[in-house]
Structures are given as structure tokens and as C-alpha cells.
Amino acid sequence: PYEADALINQLCHYGVDREYAIARRSHEYLLQHPTWPTEWILQALSIAWYDYLYTGDSRSLESSYELLKPRILMALREKNGLISTTTGLQTDDFLRSIRFKGQIRDIVDWPHTGILGLGKKQGGEDDGFAFTDYNVVTNAWHYAALKQMEGIAGALGKQDDVAFYASESDAFKKRFIRSFFDVRKGYFTDGLAADTDHASLHG
């Protein structure tokens, strides 16, 4: 399984069934056997949080709490405060902390141009996204993970962690907007202004 598929299936499953164990089982399996996309590692927080919101059962949060923390990917933050998978921060210790063998990399959307039967110039689902060292999509998921970890910590009564993640998410939101929002054009760009002015807009 893949985290992104598990997240979609989880929310669909909640809409048609009264028993939510399948989604939780997939989530707990993926915590031990994660897949390669950066954003999907971050989506572990979404899956965990939605499991709690829909069931009110905090047991999975409790047992997975220490596994969830490194999946916020704070270890990949550079000096500018943004996360990146391409600037040399994927150490052996980091990869062990997320239970992954190999290097993770940003996906944005799938499939990319020219693969899985698409012609070399035939567009995929990433809408010509301009990949840089600091990608807006990846950093948006990082912000979401911080907010969700704040909620998870609150559900478990870990007030010191609540305060920490609340502070981190507030500061990161400001940094994110300052880094990626083009005030003149009125939209978020794919990466930092120094790297690209391209924006993959979805209408």
C-alpha cells in the first residue's frame, strides 16, 4: 500500500461503513513500511489524526506517537526554516527514524510527465511543476503535519508538546507565506522566488 492511497481510501471507507479497523491497520502497517514520497511520509499524520477524529479511539495514537514525531520531518529543515530532501539532510539516523531504507524524494502529484505509458512530452498530473530544493507542496504538507501533531498531542494530554507544535506551526505558517507567496501575482509559486516563478495552478 501507499500512504496517499490509504488516506483517500480511509476517508471513503468512513463514508460507507461503520467499522474503521481496515484503515487503521493499513496506517499502522505503513508506519513500519513507509514508501518513498516525502509528502506521503508526512501524510501519516493525517491518517492518524483522521482515525482519531472518526473513532474517538486514541489507542493507535498512543502506541504510534513516537513513530509519528519524526514523520513531521523537522530533521529536514534547512537554515531558512523550510524542509528539503535534496540538501544533504537525509542522514542514516533520520532514515532509521522514519523506518525507510533509501532516500525519500518529493512527488507533488502522480504520474509525472513522460512515464507510465505517457509520451516524453505528454503531460502527467503534476502540471509542469518546477521542482526545486524547496517545493511548496512538500512544505505545505509539513505545515499540515505540524498542526495535526498539535491535535494529536492534545488528544493524548501532552500539553508541553501541544505548546511546542502550536508555536512551530504558527512560525512555520508565516515563513511559508513569506517564502512562497508572490504578492504581486497573488498566488503561491512552486518553489522559492530565487529558483522559479512558475505556479502549477488548479482551477
Please annotate each region the language model reported.
Residues 1-93, 123, 135:
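Substrate-binding groove/exosite segments of carbohydrate-active enzymes
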